[in-house]
Amino acid sequence: MKNLTGIFSALLVAFNEDGSINEQGLRQIIRHNIDKMKVDGLYVGGSTGENFMLSTAEKKEIFRIAKDEAKDQIALIAQVGSVNLQEAVELGKYATELGYDCLSAVTPFYYKFSFAEIKHYYDTIIAETGNNMIVYSIPFLTGVNIGVEQFGELYKNPKILGVKFTAGDFYLLERLKKAYPNHLIWAGFDEMMLPAVALGVDGAIGSTFNVNAPRARQIFELTKQGKLAEALAVQHVTNDLIEGILANGLYLTIKELLKLQGVEAGYCREPMTAKATDKQLEVAKALYAKFL
């Protein structure tokens, strides 16, 4: 297994206008991340990949393309989580057979599952696949909050390496790192990377890293070195960019920024708005000129 610390892009997926996967575009996004953004790895099949609007077959196809293009150049994490446990197991087995370095799974959502049910979900995926696991905690979208003691229960399974922490509760983040120093934490909010690194996270997984990974690495390394004023200056610039991206439409804007760099980033998947408006295109061009 490759080193799983550092800067990981949450991989965007290029779609054609009819909603099908644009394989050529997806390969270009992967190459851009490896060759230009110099990321340490890719987090494939997450929210940024518009994953929860895709069929099982489409999710497998994205895993296949990503592994085929990246090969062994960087670390690959496959997000296989689903409210359908059988699908999660099927995807986990497939990604493991492809040679993914680790699995990740979002906490099961929509229904108010008990913690015992959530623990069973992770233990089942691990038992069926034999692969290592990263818990994907994103409570503002799932409504699932896992506490310090509950993480301790999850961590009794030695295959669970840590958590992708996409939450603003930095008290919980600090408590987790103190309680379980041997378990890894990946920051999931790009705009709060500096304080997360100051609290000891081991890496970061972000959507904006598809276009802004060099700055993310600067923040990560400068903060680790204790150069907080310098890191904060880079975080300010990063957050100015993120503010513009969020106001203009997150995934559409990142895809337009990639297109301005010659990457065939394609469309978004409906029911998201598939195509940027003229106004959104103008904003993307302005962001590109100012920040990239």
Swiss-Prot record:
Gene Ontology biological-process annotations: carbohydrate metabolic process; N-acetylneuraminate catabolic process
GO molecular function: N-acetylneuraminate lyase activity
UniProt EC number: 4.1.3.3
Described purpose of this protein according to its UniProt entry: Catalyzes the reversible aldol cleavage of N-acetylneuraminic acid (sialic acid; Neu5Ac) to form pyruvate and N-acetylmannosamine (ManNAc) via a Schiff base intermediate.
Record keywords, A-Z: Carbohydrate metabolism, Cytoplasm, Lyase, Schiff base
Localization terms from the record: Cytoplasm
Subunit comment: Homotetramer.
Chain segments annotated as coiled-coil in the UniProt record: none
Keyword Lyase: yes
Binding sites annotated in the UniProt record for aceneuramate: 47-48, 166, 188, 190-191, 207
Protein name (Swiss-Prot/TrEMBL): N-acetylneuraminate lyase
Gene that encodes the chain: nanA
Pfam families xref list: DHDPS
Enzyme class: lyase
Biological or metabolic pathway of the protein: Amino-sugar metabolism; N-acetylneuraminate degradation; D-fructose 6-phosphate from N-acetylneuraminate: step 1/5
Active site location: 136 (proton donor), 164 (schiff-base intermediate with substrate)
Species of the source: Actinobacillus pleuropneumoniae serotype 5b (strain L20)
Protein family: Belongs to the DapA family. NanA subfamily.
Enzymatic reactions: aceneuramate = aldehydo-N-acetyl-D-mannosamine + pyruvate
CDD domains: NAL
Gene Ontology terms: cellular component: cytosol
